């Protein structure tokens, strides 16, 4: 094998020390410990500076933005909730006013229709009263006409009956008196 890659015992140049002993783990070697500690300190300081100056401000700004956005969203939600509550109150107020107006319009319409129907009823009653009076006059006139015709018919019938039964022609004046007396008795 090539030099530095190992020997027959499997030891390598990196791990074998003089005298055939294995060398300690490189970070624990006494002669390189101080330089490794300085390197660690430099790396830690560099990492600390990078993290504190670059990474943490970015993370902090993201967290601040997120917190601000949450606060803004919460404030907007509160504002919108207030607006929706106000809108709901306004809607309920408008609805109550609309109901009141509808009831007032309904009552007014009902009163107007009742008044109109009452006026129409009175007008119809007056017309019916006039027609009834006219009908009563017509009936009275028809009755008088009929009664005058009845008197004539009764006189003719009585004359015919007397003539049929007795064979004599009755006296007109006596017949008229008898018919008048009979008709007056039936009207009373």
From Swiss-Prot:
It is a single-pass membrane protein. It is found in: Cell inner membrane. GO terms for molecular function: proton-transporting ATP synthase activity, rotational mechanism; proton-transporting ATPase activity, rotational mechanism. It holds the Pfam family ATP-synt_B. The chain crosses the membrane at residues 37-57. GO terms for cellular component: plasma membrane; proton-transporting ATP synthase complex. Disulfide bonds: none annotated. Residues 1-23 are annotated as: Disordered. It comes from the Bacteria. InterPro entries: ATP_synth_b/b'su_bac/chlpt, ATP_synthase_B_chain. Keywords: ATP synthesis, Cell inner membrane, Cell membrane, CF(0), Hydrogen ion transport, Ion transport, Membrane, Transmembrane, Transmembrane helix, Transport. HAMAP family: ATP_synth_b_bprime (MF_01398). F-type ATPases have 2 components, F(1) - the catalytic core - and F(0) - the membrane proton channel. F(1) has five subunits: alpha(3), beta(3), gamma(1), delta(1), epsilon(1). F(0) has three main subunits: a(1), b(2) and c(10-14). The alpha and beta chains form an alternating ring which encloses part of the gamma chain. F(1) is attached to F(0) by a central stalk formed by the gamma and epsilon chains, while a peripheral stalk is formed by the delta and b chains. This is ATP synthase subunit b 2.
